[in-house]
């Protein structure tokens, strides 16, 4: 059995390699992989994000009234994602062609005060 120092050294080397690989990810071509690495998400965290988007997608399909602050609260509560971080999440999922109706509706909910990052989604120009 390897000693603890050797195991720690191997883990540190693997962490370094993963960081280098993460830096090589193109957020436009691989938006979800880049997001997962940037936010240090597990597969369960990614599933949770999908669950949140699905909940709001269902509200849109049911034509329910939506308070978009609830989306922000869900991401904050379940994944510790700030408003700034949520913009990255929305951009990534939209670029990946996932939950695009939710992404568009969320971005459009800001009206004329939509952030620069989300403006193209609100206008329906980005995917």
Where are the predicted features?
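Long, leucine- and charge-enriched amphipathic alpha-helices
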Residues: 1-35
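Short, charge-rich amphipathic segments
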Residues: 3-8, 37-44, 117-126
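Short, well-structured alpha-helical interface segments that form or flank functional binding sites
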Residues: 6-9, 13-16, 44, 48-51, ...
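Intrinsic-disorder-associated interaction segments
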Residues: 7-10, 14, 42, 64, ...
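Amphipathic alpha-helical interaction modules
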Residues: 25-80
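Amphipathic alpha-helical binding modules
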Residues: 76-127
